[in-house]
A protein has these predicted regions:
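Conserved N-terminal segment of class I S-adenosyl-L-methionine
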Residues: 6-9, 14-27, 38-181, 191, ...
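S-adenosyl-L-methionine-dependent methyltransferase catalytic module, highlighting the catalytic core
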Residues: 187-189, 198-207, 216-297
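Conserved SAM-binding site of S-adenosyl-L-methionine-dependent methyltransferases, i.e.
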Residues: 194
Length: 298
C-alpha cells in the first residue's frame, strides 16, 4: 500500500479496527508512518495506542473490565435486583446452564470430553461460569475449575454455582501455571479469551503447562471476515478501550496450531447482527472458530 495515499491507508486501518483487529490496524498505520510521516498517521496511531493501555499491566486490565461491568450494571437498573433474586432461588443458574448446553461451541466441547474422558478440567476465562456449570451439571464425575480475570464475574459465578464439582477463582489465563501444579488437567478450554490477551503465546504456554501430556486444549475465538462496500467512518471503541485487540483467520490458526497433535478446527456460523456495524460492511464469514489439539507426550 502506498503510504503517500493517506486516505486509502486510513480506510484500511479503519477496516481492521471494525474487525476488532486493533494490533493489525496499528501495524498498518505505523508501517505507513515510517514511509511517509504524515501527521494524520501520528494522530491515529496515538489514539489506537490509547485503546490498548489497559494491557500495560494486570491491574490496568482488571480495572478496565470492572469499569465496563460497573457501567453495565448502572444501565441495567432494577433488572440487576431481579437478577440477584433469581440467583438466590437458583432460577438463573438453571437458565444459564440450559442455554450454554445448547450452544454449538459447547457441543464441540462435549465431543472433546467424549474423546478425552477427563477427570479434571480447567476453564481458563470462565466469565459468569455458564460453560463450567453446564459441563459440571452434565458430567457429575468431573472436577471443573474456573479461572476468571474479572472479580465481579468470579463473584457472580460463585453465587450462581449449585454444583459441588465446580469451583471458581479470580485470576488470569496467562498465569494458570501459578495456580495449579504442572500436568493437573486432562482437558483445558478457553472460550472467547485469546482475542483479549496481550500475548497469545504466553497464554498458551501457561495453559499447556497445567495440561497433562496427551491432554487436550480447546479454544474458541471470533470469526470476523467482512467486506467493505462503501466508505468506512471513523472508529471509537464502545467501552473506551479495545476489549478485543486481535482477530484470527483460518489460515493463521492452521499455521500456528495445525502442526500440533490431533489438530481440529471447526467453523461455527453465527448470526449477523444488522445495525451492530455501519452499513458499509457486510459479512463474508461470521461466527467463531473452535480449535483443539493434544499436548505432546501422551
Amino acid at each position: 500500500m502506498d503510504p503517500h495515499d493517506v486516505d486509502a491507508v486510513i480506510q484500511s486501518a479503519r477496516f481492521e479496527l471494525y474487525r476488532e483487529n486493533i494490533y493489525g490496524a496499528l501495524e498498518i498505520i505505523e508501517t505507513a508512518q515510517a514511509g511517509h510521516p504524515d501527521p494524520r498517521y501520528a494522530e491515529l496511531a496515538t489514539r489506537i495506542r490509547s485503546w490498548l493501555t489497559h494491557l500495560d499491566s494486570r491491574e490496568a486490565y482488571v480495572a478496565a473490565q470492572e469499569e465496563q461491568y460497573r457501567r453495565l450494571r448502572w444501565r441495567m437498573g432494577l433488572k440487576l435486583l431481579e437478577k440477584r433474586i433469581r440467583m438466590l432461588i437458583g432460577r438463573k443458574t438453571r437458565k444459564l446452564v440450559d442455554r450454554r448446553a445448547r450452544d454449538p461451541e459447547f457441543q464441540e466441547l462435549e465431543r472433546e470430553v467424549d474423546r478425552v474422558r477427563p477427570r479434571r478440567v480447567l476453564d481458563a476465562g470462565s466469565g459468569e461460569g455458564g460453560v463450567a456449570m453446564a459441563l459440571g451439571a452434565r458430567h457429575p464425575d468431573l472436577r471443573v475449575e474456573g479461572v476468571e480475570v474479572s472479580p465481579t464475574n468470579a463473584k457472580i459465578a460463585r453465587q450462581l454455582n449449585r454444583f459441588g464439582n465446580v469451583g471458581f477463582r479470580q485470576g488470569f489465563a496467562e498465569e494458570v501455571h501459578l495456580y495449579f501444579p504442572a500436568g493437573s488437567f486432562d482437558l483445558v478450554y478457553s472460550f472467547a479469551v485469546l482475542e483479549h490477551v496481550r500475548d497469545v503465546a504466553e497464554t498458551v504456554r501457561s495453559i499447556e503447562t497445567v495440561l497433562r501430556p496427551g491432554g487436550r486444549f480447546a479454544f474458541v475465538v471470533p470469526m470476523h471476515e467482512l467486506r467493505a462496500i462503501g466508505p468506512i467512518p471513523d472508529y471509537t471503541p464502545i467501552h473506551g478501550y479495545a476489549d478485543h485487540c486481535r482477530v484470527f483467520t483460518e489460515k493463521e490458526l492452521r499455521q500456528t496450531f495445525g502442526p500440533r497433535k490431533d489438530f481440529r478446527l471447526v467453523k461455527v456460523p453465527g448470526a449477523w447482527k444488522h445495525g451492530e456495524l455501519p452499513a458499509c460492511f457486510e459479512p463474508i464469514e461470521f461466527g467463531s472458530f473452535f480449535v483443539s489439539y493434544a499436548k505432546d507426550g501422551g
